UniProtKB/Swiss-Prot annotation:
Any GO MF annotation of the entry: RNA binding
SMART domains (UniProt xref): DEXDc, HELICc
InterPro entries recorded: DEAD/DEAH_box_helicase_dom, Helicase_ATP-bd, Helicase_C-like, P-loop_NTPase, RNA-helicase_DEAD-box_CS, RNA_helicase_DEAD_Q_motif
Location of region: Disordered: 1-43, 95-167, 801-855
ATP-binding as UniProt keyword: yes
Source organism (scientific name): Lodderomyces elongisporus (strain ATCC 11503 / CBS 2605 / JCM 1781 / NBRC 1676 / NRRL YB-4239) (Yeast)
Motif window: DEAD box: 386-389
Entry protein name: ATP-dependent RNA helicase MAK5
Length: 855
């Protein structure tokens, strides 16, 4: 179409098309402005204060490759919420659309209507602006009325088309609103997920019995007592054969009887009490469903008490693996331990989990703060004591006794659906008379009758108490339901697992580091080293790291997060490297199931026999073999070692009149002294560096503490405080300062240590020829059987080396050999002391002469 302007000239077609494109583009911009919120809309969205229970907390999904995620358990998060402190109390403020989504029961229909009204007002304003701009554009169009009308009609058609697309945007908006409603619905579902996840799988269909093949579980009629859910979990976990303790205790526990179970470490005691609890819960599914419909919080089926936090979390993991195909989901098994958020644990307990694994301290704290919680927990069906010997001593029993008293007082007496007393299951690897004597001080001097005969002092040498005595001691404290609880001893003639090979390394008291390094260098694998003090643990870790051996620490002074991180790092290092070491105090001696522990090394002899048994039980688990090595000085061999071996070996005797061979099961570890002499300079340098690091750290902490105390007391001159210090403290400080090294000295020692570590150790000091000596090194290298760190030595394993070359300890009357070694060491020490005294006297004389000359 040809268009004309006012002066009669024809307007080019390109100009007309350009104007049409400009107008179309402007209309599109107008539609885009409709969807953008105005300042008025933003100001209308007011902040709202909500309660913490109304927020849509979402559980954080932790990937499997993160392990325990730095020690966080049951972490939850919330988005779009601000926290403001008003009068010392937190207030949760919700702002914007994201904040509205963070509220669980929020209805935002009124806000959406208000936003719609704002959109209509804004649309009218934009249309007026558009008409004004169109009037400016009309000045460039010709005066021909028909053509102007045609252009206007054309523009209206374009507007109608744009408005049609705008209608499509409205539809899209409605779809978006519907998606938002779905998101709100999903968010509400996420809110209730934590609450109802424990009952989400109640209608789970039964597995097919034909797919489950566990013939050995059916030998003792255990399979007929178990549901297909549990059998399916056992089949998938490859637990095809029940252990002796499981065969004998599971049927008794399923019958509702009180059970006292004793078995060696690593024998499957967790499943021995875990399977009956899971079965009890599955049998009560109908009651659980009814209470869920009535919105009544269920009482727990079982409460398991563990002495340590790590053991409690480990029990939860094991039960979750077995229950992964059962109606009880992972949120139905809850751990209640110290070191984690108590508010989080209160919220989890308010949802009614089926199984609770707790430490006594945190459980008592929760029960004292919430009476309703005590009433619900007191209705439990089963109470389990795992590692009972530890749980009933060292202050744990006072807390546990208070919990039992609260449960007894609050347990309903007239409820027919609940038995008058809960079922009690007690499991441990050791039941010693000395340990149980601490429970009842009044009976320390009294004899407890068993089998109609009074026990006298002559029988006190046995490591285990008689069966009747165990029941008598436990009955008064634990208040069993049955008059005669069933006692099951799966290993009556074993106190240490038969899969553990016990060994001994004879060394001086100051040579433990040297022989420990020799053991770790010669025998590759993962090793758990136990020490009696936290200071020794802190010293050994840097010493081994200086020797290029990856070492990690775990002790009671570490917070829970640090302990779990050390365990995860040790597991990762043991998978990547041939040698990994975890140095621990006795906090890791009980219950922990750390996979693939090849050796357990006792850097110090334990203070009691039960600790030695549980320490050694960290290896040779689940039917595997392991090695337990003791580093013993002559002073320890003459006293503590003999008592320990007598206590352990006494239980292996068939009858009381049989002669006990104290050293029958202990072998001497073969030690090559030529290799030890080459390793000595390395250990000395690494020890000096480790001592320097520890002393500087201790001095730094002490100085910071003294400065802080002086500032609080207003003391300016710190030198005056030295006059009031004790002489012992001054000596300790001088001893620490003497071990400190300056930076240049540390650099020099580290350089020397690197040079020594770079040079390989050579067997028999061989230097030149690969084929010389008794061992053909070239042949070993071709076959790939040579030792990586010792030239001329083949690869060896501690277990095989002990079986081939390990010699049994010959008990010489009076231990003449040990006494001779002790005398030699005493003479050497006496000579050193005499030299020091003579040196001090010479210095005093010189100092006295110099003072006289000055006068």
């Amino acid at each position: 179409m040809v268009k004309t302007v006012a002066n009669g000239k024809k307007k080019p077609q390109k100009v007309v098309k350009k104007q049409q494109k400009t107008q179309k583009k402007h209309n599109q911009q107008k539609l885009q402005k409709r969807n953008t919120p105005t300042l008025k809309q933003k100001l209308k969205k007011e902040s709202k204060i909500v309660k913490i229970n109304e927020l849509a907390w979402k559980p954080v999904e932790i990937p499997d490759n993160f392990g325990d995620f730095g020690g966080f358990y049951g972490l939850e998060e919330i988005d779009g919420v601000d926290v403001e402190m008003v009068d010392g109390k937190p207030q949760f403020v919700v702002k914007g659309e994201e904040g509205e989504k963070s509220v669980s029961n929020e209805n935002t229909t009124t806000n959406e209507l208000e936003d719609g009204d704002d959109i209509e007002v804004d649309e009218g304003e934009e249309i007026a602006q558009q008409e004004q701009e169109n009037s400016d554009n009309d000045e460039l169009i010709e005066e021909d009325a028909e053509e102007v009308e045609e252009q206007q009609q054309h523009g209206e058609k374009e507007l109608e088309e744009e408005e049609f697309t705008g209608f499509g945007d409205d539809i899209a908006k409605e779809e978006k609103d519907s998606d938002g409603a779905k998101k709100k619905l999903n968010s509400s579902e996420d809110i209730d997920e934590l609450k109802y996840n424990a009952f989400a799988n109640l209608d789970l269909p039964l597995p097919n019995d034909d797919e489950i093949d566990l013939p050995e579980w059916g030998e003792d009629k255990i399979e007929t007592c178990l549901s297909p859910y549990i059998l399916n979990g056992l089949s998938n976990m490859k637990f095809t054969t029940p252990t002796p303790i499981q065969k004998r205790t599971i049927p008794l526990a399923l019958e509702g009887k009180d059970v006292i179970g004793k078995a060696t470490t690593g024998s499957g005691k967790t499943l021995a009490y875990g399977i009956p609890i899971l079965e009890k819960y599955i049998q009560s599914l109908d009651t659980v469903k009814r209470k869920v419909r009535e919105k009544v919080v269920n009482h727990p089926t079982g409460i398991i008490f563990a002495p340590t936090r790590e053991l409690a979390h480990q029990v939860v993991d094991h039960l979750n693996k077995i229950a992964q195909y059962s109606p009880l989901s992972t949120k139905g098994i809850v751990s209640v331990t110290g070191g984690l958020s108590i508010q989080k644990q209160e919220r989890l307990l308010s949802f009614g989990p089926g199984i609770i694994v707790a430490t006594p301290g945190r459980m008592l704290e929760l029960c004292q703060n919430d009476q309703e919680l005590v009433k619900r927990l007191s209705m439990t069906d089963i109470i389990v004591l795992d590692e009972a010997d530890r749980l009933l001593q060292d202050g744990h029993f006072e807390e546990f006794e208070k919990i039992l008293e609260l449960f007894n007082k609050n347990r309903p007496k007239n409820d027919k659906s609940i038995e008058w007393k809960w079922q009690t299951l007690v499991f441990s690897a050791t039941f010693s008379r000395d340990l149980f004597g601490k429970l009842d001080k009044q009976q320390k001097q009294k004899s407890v009758k068993g089998n109609g005969k009074a026990l006298n002092k002559a029988d006190s040498g046995n490591s285990l108490v008689q069966n009747d005595e165990i029941i008598e001691l436990l009955r008064e404290k634990l208040r069993f339901k049955d008059k005669a609880p069933s006692l099951v001893d799966a290993n009556p003639k074993e106190i240490v697992s038969g899969q553990i090979t016990e060994a001994l390394v004879e060394c001086g008291p100051l040579e433990r580091d040297l022989y420990l390094y020799y053991f770790l260098l010669m025998y590759k694998g993962s090793t758990l080293v136990f020490a009696n003090s936290i200071d020794s643990v802190k010293r050994l870790v840097p010493l081994l790291n200086n020797l290029n051996i990856p070492a990690f620490a775990i002790h009671s002074s570490m917070i829970q997060k640090q302990r779990l991180r050390s365990l995860e790092r040790f597991k990762d290092a043991s998978e990547k490297n041939q040698t990994a070491v975890l140095v621990a105090s006795d906090v890791a001696a009980r219950g922990l199931d750390i996979p693939n522990i090849d050796h357990v090394a006792h850097y110090h002899l334990p203070r009691s026999a039960d600790v030695y048994i549980h320490r050694s039980g960290r290896t040779a688990r689940a039917g595997k073999e392991g090695v337990s090595v003791m580093f013993c000085s002559p002073q320890e061999a003459s006293g503590p070692l003999r008592k320990l071996r007598k206590l352990v070996a006494s239980n292996a005797a068939n009858n009381k009149n049989q002669k006990i061979n104290v050293h029958s099961d202990v072998k001497l570890l073969p030690v090559e002294m030529d290799l030890v002499s080459q390793l000595r300079p390395r250990v000395e340098l690494a020890g000096r560096l480790a001592d320097s690091n520890i002393s500087s750290t201790a001095t730094r902490k002490e100085n910071s503490w003294v400065k802080q105390a002086a500032e609080e007391l207003g003391v300016e001159d710190l030198h005056d405080l030295d006059e009031f210090e004790d002489d012992i403290i001054k000596k300790q400080r001088k001893r620490q300062e003497s071990k400190r090294l300056d930076k240049n000295e540390q650099k020099r020692l580290r350089f020397e240590l690197r040079e020594l570590l770079a040079n390989p150790i050579r067997k028999n000091n061989r230097r030149s020829y690969l084929t010389s000596g008794l061992q053909n090194l070239a042949h070993l290298m071709v076959q790939g059987t040579h030792h990586e760190d010792v030239l001329g030595h083949e690869k060896v394993k501690a277990l095989k080396d002990l079986q081939k070359n390990g010699s049994k300890i010959k008990p010489v009357k009076g231990d003449d050999k040990m006494k001779r070694i002790a005398k030699v060491n005493q003479r050497k020490q006496a000579k050193k002391d005499a030299k020091k005294d003579a040196k001090q006297k010479r210095q005093e004389l010189r100092h006295g002469h110099s003072n006289k000359s000055e006068e």
